[in-house]
Amino acid sequence: MTAPLNRKMYFLTDPIEDRAKDWLDYKINYQATFAAQLMYPMVDTYEVMPWPDRIYQGLYRIAGTDQKERIPRSYSTQMQVMINTLNDIRTSDKQISGTHGIGVLMANSLMFQRFPDHNGYDDPQFSSFYGQTLPLLKRGIPVELVHMENTPFKDTFNGLQVLVMSYSNMKPMKSEYHNYLADWVKKGGTLVYCGEDVDPYQTVLEWWNTAGNAYKAPSEHLFEAMGLSRNPGDGTYRFGKGTVIVMREDPKHFVLKGGNDRKYFETIVSAYESKTGKKIEIKNNFMVERGPYTIAAVMDESSSKEPLKLSGLYIDLFDKDLPVLTVKQINPGEQGYLYDLNKVLGKVKAKVLCGASRIYDEKVGKQSYSFVAKSPLHTTNVSRVLLPRKPGKVLVNGKAEQPEWDESSKTLLLSFENDPAGVNVSIEW
């Protein structure tokens, strides 16, 4: 959506929500949205915590009860670990796993068609948009969103092979957008139009039926721009070097009833494979690597109910105890956020790899490592520290500690009470 304009984007994920739910529900949704934002490698700027006092001091329900409490220690630790990792996240040219090159057209006017029911026509819960996207997404295809208002910019169509669109849930605010779409098809693109063009918004007074125009629907103008009749039926048509596929069904029907998306999905598969000569990869998960971080999500309602199993040497960043794992299983409906230790072992002498506090004043000596850890009061720091060997001495604010050592990962598991003024940690080996 923003790539053609070279705009800087900030992602926001919230550890709690405005709706009245419980802490467990907030945690589950936070993990999902946090993983989702990391699956866009072109973005590395984030708003991490809107209204911190609302998060740390607000009272919210305990799961399964009517009692309310402030944020649980376990959740604040996990949340702070997750947020701290964002300091290391950088943009990358790596792509999320799956078949790329399939997009769905959207426009600002999506926001205008929210009337729930009019003259017997409805589009419940944004179904026409989800009807175009979810049948692809749920089969592991990282469908792209293409903004109609960006079509005048040449980079908008970069890498795009198949573009799906419908005017059942949005309308073009300018006729000129059709010229850019038609030009893209003429040069070799494949456009899939889904829609019956019977919703009430087709008849609002707009450019396609005023000022000398007499189109019954804006799609008539688009089809005419591509050398077709104003109202072509179901079928496949050629225009220049490209292809136009017409499906006379509103995309809401693809998702309002189970199994109704089959014809639509088969149409997209055929269009993509005919255009590229490549097979579409169908799967139930997405995964991307960003530096030492591996982000994965396994979907429910997908092509398979199998879990995703990752083998290696990882720290589980969605677990407050930061366990070291050799196998991570992610079930349908779940996400995983892992630190890949194999990407740092032997490359870094000493470093706090992850933790629930911000690290300052790091000093690495021949046989020592020290730092200051800062984080909010009434929260617990848990961190994993990479060292060349098992330490002989660990001091936390001058007090000797005996934290857990993991030989396989060469990491020390530290835990102590956080302090915004700073906690001094000194390690010798």
Where are these regions (language model features)?
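Short, well-ordered secondary-structure micro-motifs within conserved domains or adaptor modules
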Residues: F157-M170
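A short, well-structured beta->alpha microelement
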Residues: T133-T156
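Surface-exposed interaction regions enriched in Ser/Thr/Asp/Glu
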Residues: S415-W429
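Hydrophobic targeting/anchoring helices
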Residues: M1-F129, P232-G233, I245-E249, F254-G258, ...
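Solvent-exposed beta-strand/loop surfaces of large extracellular or lumenal domains
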Residues: S311-Q329, L395-L414
